[in-house]
Amino acid sequence: YLQSLDKWLGDTKWDVIHFNVGLHDLCYRHPDAKAYGSRDKVKGTQAVPPEKYEKNLETIVLRLKKTGAKIIFANTTVVPEGEAGRKVGDDLRYNEVAAKVMARHGIPVNDLHALTTTFPAELFVKPGDVHFKPVGSQKLAEQVSAVIVEQLQLPKAE
C-alpha cells in the first residue's frame, strides 16, 4: 500500500479521499497454512502489528493531506467468529489505533465496523468470512456514499 500510494494519487486534484487499511494488516499468515491466502491465526504471524500499523497510518495520512482533499477514514469491518486468519477483537484494537491517528489529524471516521456488527449472517459470503454478499456490499456503499456527500456538503439525492 505505502509503495503504491504516490502512483495511485498521481497528479489528480482530489476533492475527497475515502480510504481504509486494516483488515489485511491484522491478518495472521503462515506459509504452510491450507486456508486461502495462507491464513492461520494459530501458527501464523500478524501481517502488520498494531505499532507498525499506527506508523503506516501516520505516513498515509500525511501523504493524503498533501493532496488538499477532504479525507475520510473508514474503519475496519467486523471480524466474524471462525475466520481462519483473523482473531475476533483485533478489529476493535486496530480501529482504536486508527481512531487515535485520525483524531490527531482531525480526520472524520466512517464507522463501517458499527454498521457491519448489525449485519445478519446471511449478508456474509459464508460463516467465518470477512467478505460480504452483494446486498451487504450495497449497504456498505450506501453508508460510504452518504458520508462522502455529507463531507462534500452536496445536496442529498431524493
Question: What are the residue ranges of the model-derived segments?
Answer:
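Alpha-helical cap/lid subdomain in secreted, periplasmic
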Residues: 3-158
